[in-house]
Amino acid sequence: MRPKLKAGLLPVWRDRNTLQFGVDPRRAVALRGMGEVAAIVSLLDGSRDQSGLIDAAQEQGVPAQAASRVLGLLAAAGVLDDFPAALHAGLPDLVRARLAPELATLSLAYGDGDGGARTLTRRRAAFVRVHGAGRTGACVATFLAASGVGHVACADPGPAQPADLAPAGLVEADLGAPRQEGAARAVARAAPEVSTRDDGALPDLVILTGPVLPDLAGRLMRDRVPHLAAWAGEAIGVVGPLVRPGRSACLGCVDRRKADADPQWPMILAQATFDRAEPQACDTVLAAMTAALASAQALALIDRAGAEPVTVNGTLEVVLPDWQWRRRTWPPHPACPCGAVTMR
């Protein structure tokens, strides 16, 4: 082990003898008896194994037994990581520096003790395809790429319009070109090392940010590809459901539930699938909010095998000018042929 203080935790003194790691009480850990051994904290940079660290502490005047005790206390408190030297060595300097906040966040959020290495490795191995590359879709693509996902492709051959432009997505130079090409350039700006090629291979996850044609939904179900819906319009943002084919409510289940509540829903849906209001009531902030939450749900699935993000059998929704996202539950529908209802 190469002990390293968890990145993102600032050491602060509570008094002359008590050192606190982290500022917010929801993350912070305080240890007493640190006054005479505080020098060891500056050595927790991951450059030494435990034996080398104890030797270095002795050079700073900290007895070996005291140094070993402090390391044990810090490890038990969950503020140490085993420095992921192999991961760092395999990343170019700029990429490593850019992904440092991602690693720091993963280390604190999941507490795996490896500095976020295994989770980032999962992200770098993942392939996500985003259908739709307008305001929301292009932002999703860049957010995922910047978060460490190694392969992000967009599918949207339509020409980019001025209303598609957004700070984290398409730019003025993309106008008139296929939106998917503009999204690929946006990904390259955010994370040049990320692949945007799409050879038709099955992705690990599909994100649907526009109207979903029945043949696409059916193909995803047949191929057992997890897929997440994300939509913003009418001054409303909706993220979900996250469909795990055959295991959770699918898009058809949701539409059947809506039809149960409103018998005219199938007629409305058929029209909305092939037409839309212009301009869309999806301002820059709503698009970014929806894209950010959709990206978070996608990463929740990628980061943990067998994870059940909150959008499984549900949606997260915000209705402007409200600020609060609320969850709606969508159980599998008994009349849907997707088979999820039998898994419950």
Report each predicted region and the residues it spans.
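Adenine nucleotide-associated cytosolic modules
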Residues: 1-344
